[in-house]
């Protein structure tokens, strides 16, 4: 692959496996050297929470096992970026909504940046 060739990112494929709760298939969309950044009430922009591929996998498995319903909407992809809105609905009715930006390299997600808000308990 030369420098001008880009691998197209299948955001709709990611949406399908994400909403189906197929964690192993979701993780195939990610680079193993992922940088995951989360900004929320407990982790402001000046001090965001950061994690890696393994942590993301554990979080997704926990969501699937905990009965959390996941939706991915407003998907867009182009060039070396993709974005979406993710909604997680917890069994108690609370919701988390995240605006997510994916940075891509060679068709894989290398950085995921989430700005999220959760219903109060």
Place the predicted regions along the sequence by residue.
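Ligand-binding pocket scaffold of soluble enzyme catalytic domains
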Residues: 72, 80, 92
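A solvent-exposed, acidic/Ser-Thr-rich amphipathic alpha-helical stretch
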Residues: 23-77
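Short, low-complexity N-terminal intrinsically disordered segments enriched in polar/charged residues
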Residues: 1-28, 32-33, 121
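Short, solvent-exposed coil/turn segments at beta-strand boundaries
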Residues: 33, 77-82, 102-110
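Short loop/turn motifs at secondary-structure junctions and domain boundaries
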Residues: 17, 65-66, 92-94
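Short beta-strand segments that buttress and anchor functional surface loops
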Residues: 84-91
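Short beta-strand edge/turn micro-motifs at domain boundaries
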Residues: 95-121
């Amino acid at each position: 692959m030369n420098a001008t060739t880009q691998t197209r990112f299948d955001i709709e494929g990611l949406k399908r496996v994400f909403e189906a709760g197929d964690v192993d298939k979701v993780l195939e969309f990610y680079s193993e050297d992922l940088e995951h950044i989360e900004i929320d009430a407990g982790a402001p922009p000046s001090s965001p929470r950061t994690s890696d591929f393994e942590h993301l996998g554990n979080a997704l498995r926990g969501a699937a096992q905990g009965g959390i319903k996941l939706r991915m909407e407003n998907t867009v992809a182009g060039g070396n970026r993709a974005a979406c809105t993710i909604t997680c609905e917890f069994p108690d009715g609370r919701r988390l909504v995240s605006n997510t930006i994916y940075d891509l390299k060679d068709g894989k997600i290398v950085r995921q940046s989430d700005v999220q808000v959760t219903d109060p308990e």
